[in-house]
């Protein structure tokens, strides 16, 4: 950090840091708070910003007010991103909970997203195990464990086998 930067008020330094963090990708409010509170790596090692709790609150409020920080937008984008990577609804819910998103906001976004979880689970199975799907019990159990680990619900997993039999 340069000498002129260290003389800037803590609020201005925090705001600059928040905008830089949010310019890379969307964050939840809790993630942003955690990153702002973490020490900055400077040329001479970690450096703390001497900011008050009021400075942090003002920065968060400014980010909300100017559209840089929006938990509902973050949740929608996070769900879309993780589902494209093949993760199921249970895992996505758990990850959002870890990021400080309320259960109500998560459930609202999950209802609003237009994702066919059963089709997504089937795509994951065919990508990993190929067509046709195995009929041997031990292979079915292996696939079930894989999908449960990826965060799919048991009803979606069972639908794969029901639809496969048709």
Swiss-Prot record:
Provenance organism: Escherichia coli (strain SE11)
Subcellular location(s) per record: Cytoplasm
Any Pfam family the entry gives: RecX_HTH3
Keyword line: Cytoplasm
Gene: recX
Cited InterPro entries: RecX_HTH_1st (IPR053926), RecX_HTH_2nd (IPR053924), RecX_HTH_3rd (IPR053925), Regulatory_RecX (IPR003783), WH-like_DNA-bd_sf (IPR036388)
Function summary: Modulates RecA activity.
Signal peptide start and end residues: none
Keyword Cytoplasm: yes
Protein name per the record: Regulatory protein RecX
């Amino acid at each position: 950090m340069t000498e002129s930067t260290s003389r800037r008020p803590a609020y201005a330094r925090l705001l600059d840091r928040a905008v830089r963090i949010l310019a890379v990708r969307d964050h939840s409010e809790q993630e942003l708070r955690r990153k702002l509170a973490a020490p900055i790596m400077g040329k001479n090692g970690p450096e703390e910003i001497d900011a008050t709790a009021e400075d942090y609150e003002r920065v968060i409020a400014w980010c909300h007010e100017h559209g840089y920080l929006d938990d509902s937008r973050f949740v929608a984008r996070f769900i879309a991103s993780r589902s494209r990577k093949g993760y199921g609804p249970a895992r996505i819910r758990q990850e959002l909970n870890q990021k400080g998103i309320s259960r109500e906001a998560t459930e609202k976004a999950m209802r609003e997203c237009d994702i066919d979880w059963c089709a997504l689970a089937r795509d994951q199975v065919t990508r990993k195990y190929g067509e046709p799907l195995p009929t041997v019990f031990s292979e079915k159990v292996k696939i079930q464990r894989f999908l449960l680990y990826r965060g799919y619900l048991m009803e979606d997993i069972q639908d794969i086998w029901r639809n496969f039999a048709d």
